[in-house]
Amino acid sequence: HKIFVLNKNFEEYFKEYNFHKLYKELVNFCSLELSAFYFDIRKDTLYCDEISSSKRQACINLLGLILDMLLKWFAPILSFTTEEIFQIIYKDKNSSIHLQDFPIIPSKWQNDKLAEKWEKFKNIRKVVNAAMEIKRANKEIGSSLEADIKVFLNDDYLQLVEDFDLSENFITSKAEATKMSNENNLFKLEEIENIKVLVTKATGEKCPRCWKIFAGP
């Protein structure tokens, strides 16, 4: 969906010669959506899953698609840089990034419902990250993998998280969701309602491969 939206905006900005907006949106996508979010939650899949893992292969395929899109979107702005990258990646093509067609993204990639779902989930992740930062500041945990997370949610959010692997998306050793509670020791952000978090230090043995901490048998 995000690729569909970016490409639609690219076409609009390009026709209007509005390269500043184009550049700003692409940079924000790289720094906020990719670096600060997608790369963060997918690095364990790339590093720790088996080479034959379907999830790992899907991630690699998506990264290849994103790279191809970014090269074509950035080509009118960063002509030499994109050409250099293209020649490194596609050195056997004997071609140029500037001879490639601009992307044509099928309309079925547009999925506003899915985008809204992820935006709501990012609210939960924001509260969880803020709660873990306090634990880090107090020297109670080091990395997020030293944390066990329990999120307290209203019914709408509880239904939302059924489709998410919470520990993977929070980058913690363990995570679970439960119904909202009025306990006083729970962390919350005033600007985000219906989400509370309890962070405890994970106990057990640290896996030497993924670095997650698992309780013994």
For the regions a language model picked out, list residue spans one by one.
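Acidic, turn-prone loop/beta-hairpin segments
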Residues: 1-8, 40-131, 138-158, 178-196
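Short functional micro-motifs and their immediate structural scaffolds
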Residues: 212-215
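Short helix-adjacent coil turns
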Residues: 14-21
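Immediate flanking context of iron-sulfur cluster ligation sites
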Residues: 196-205
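Short cysteine-rich clusters marking metal-coordination/redox-active sites
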Residues: 207-210
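A glycine-rich helix N-cap at a beta->alpha junction
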Residues: 164-181
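Hydrophobic residues within the alpha-helices of tandem HEAT/HEAT-like
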Residues: 30-31
